[in-house]
Design a protein with these regions (language model features):
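Mature-chain termini and adjacent capping regions
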Residues: 1-177
Length: 177
């Protein structure tokens, strides 16, 4: 009777592996998500930048680790002394963790400490190399000049030495009192 009872129990408790896999499979789902967040990024206990976002998703998959900001960001960048040196806004952003590379899309605006304003629809920020670049139309407003590059630009991240591709013109802006 013990053998019969054990056999009945063995066959009555059957696990469907497809059901188990479906429960454990979270591919495509964020590991962490949050709304109306402020994220602080530091290095050696010094604040490097702060990101404010309405929606944050963190993905930690085997081959890809990235943070996604599907509703955009406002980021503030800081010097070692704590002074703010610039800001970045965009309607969409994604940060690849291992590469330390930001992809910013849709109405990207960068303003540096000197007040230079860069506008483009797509920009990459390589934090390892400390450069920003784009292959799309870009516009830099600096004081009384506007520089437009039809094929993008490349610059240090502080926008002190931008190089534009296929410049369409430098326009002097007249400031009237």
């Amino acid at each position: 009777t013990v053998l019969v009872l054990g056999t009945v129990m063995l066959f009555s408790c059957k696990t469907n592996m497809k059901d188990v896999d479906a429960i454990g499979n979270r591919n495509g789902m964020p590991e962490m998500s949050g709304e109306n967040m402020e994220l602080f990024y530091s290095d050696s206990a010094l604040l490097k930048y702060k990101v404010i976002t309405p929606l944050y998703n963190k993905y930690n998959q085997d081959d890809k680790k990235y943070d996604e900001f599907p509703k955009g960001i406002h980021a503030e960048l800081y010097e070692k002394d704590g002074s703010m040196v610039g800001s970045i806004t965009s309607k969409y952003a994604k940060k690849l963790e291992d590469e330390m590379l930001w992809e910013l899309r849709n109405e990207v605006v960068v303003i540096n400490a000197e007040g230079k304003k860069l506008e483009t629809d797509l920009m990459f920020w390589d934090m390892k190399k400390e450069i920003v670049y784009s292959d799309r139309y870009s516009r830099l407003t600096s004081g009384d000049q506007i520089i437009e590059g039809n094929k993008g630009f490349k610059s240090d991240q502080s926008l002190k030495n931008p190089v534009f591709n296929k410049i369409t013109g430098v326009v002097e802006i007249e400031n009237k009192p």
